């Protein structure tokens, strides 16, 4: 495999023009944008939509600005999705802490007791790891002022306080580790969700949250986990192929469906308006919508 050598900004631009057929009308602006974003993040990240599959070169008429516009669109998407994913994360944390403490208590001896979890079979090592994570946060020298305060003043940290330091991935595992009666109560806080359905939503949402938080490419991201089939698929008339829904399982539209299922009606409407504004700000090609996993009638989800 040929080694990738360092190229100056001028050399990068010349390579794109001469070797890849990209039109660049303003070289100085292109250099400024490469400095701002980096070649890998901008060009490698967003070139595929604009390339010819046969030659690997850009299609005729594609300009540097087209790539940067898609980059900006994706950047706005990340900010929007992260905002509302964090809303759900806070709500799930609040719900789990409430129902756990209501059932078992809020002391360390309560939430560090494996008997208060579904401690069987394959879940045992997951719960053991979770106990290490929870107990590891109970330190006088914690980075979090509220943890230090509770440890100093009360020598323990209530679960409803400790939940704030958990990542969404840890929260997802904590939910999956709960006994059925706790999971059912949490699901009831979000309507008529099934226990496993919410578990899959949290697993999928964790991956999308990480993509947003780390500024990775979002619009065509796919997760290994997939949402379970639910009534929302049928109500949106999402087509199937070989018995499997072709949109909304593990693509970005899956995250839209999660937001629809877990946000309040008012919050989802606010999110939906912002998403529409994002599309209006960045007119995109249908090929991008396809890569996002958005069906042609995706707007129906606001009324579903």
Language-model regions, residue ranges each:
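Extended intrinsically disordered or low-complexity regions, especially N/C-terminal cytosolic tails and loops
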Residues: 1-207, 219-304
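Acidic/aromatic/glycine-rich contiguous surface patches that form carbohydrate-binding/processing clefts
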Residues: 215
């Amino acid at each position: 495999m040929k080694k990738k050598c360092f190229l100056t900004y001028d050399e990068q631009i010349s390579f794109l023009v001469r070797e890849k057929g990209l039109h660049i009308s303003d070289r100085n602006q292109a250099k400024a944008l490469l400095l701002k974003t980096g070649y890998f993040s901008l060009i490698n990240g967003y070139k595929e939509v604009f390339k010819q599959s046969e030659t690997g070169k850009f299609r005729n008429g594609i300009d540097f600005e087209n790539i940067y516009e898609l980059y900006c669109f994706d950047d706005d998407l990340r900010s929007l999705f992260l905002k509302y994913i964090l809303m759900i994360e806070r709500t799930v944390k609040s719900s789990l802490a409430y129902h756990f403490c209501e059932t078992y208590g809020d002391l360390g001896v309560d939430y560090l007791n494996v008997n208060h979890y579904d401690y069987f079979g394959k879940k045992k090592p997951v719960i053991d790891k979770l106990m290490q994570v929870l107990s590891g946060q109970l330190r006088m020298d914690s980075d979090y002022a509220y943890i230090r305060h509770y440890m100093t003043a009360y020598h323990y940290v209530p679960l409803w306080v400790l939940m704030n330091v958990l990542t969404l991935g840890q929260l997802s595992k904590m939910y999956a580790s709960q006994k059925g009666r706790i999971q059912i109560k949490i699901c009831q806080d979000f309507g008529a969700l099934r226990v496993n359905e919410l578990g899959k939503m949290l697993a999928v949402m964790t991956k999308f949250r990480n993509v947003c938080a780390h500024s990775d490419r979002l619009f065509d991201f796919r997760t290994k986990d997939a949402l379970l089939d639910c009534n929302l698929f049928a109500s949106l008339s999402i087509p199937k192929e070989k018995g499997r829904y072709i949109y909304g399982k593990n693509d970005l539209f899956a995250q839209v469906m999660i937001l629809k299922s877990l946000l309040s009606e008012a919050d989802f409407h606010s999110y939906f308006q912002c998403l529409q504004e994002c599309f209006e700000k960045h007119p995109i090609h249908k090929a991008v919508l396809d890569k996002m996993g958005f069906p042609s009638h995706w707007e129906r989800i606001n009324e579903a």
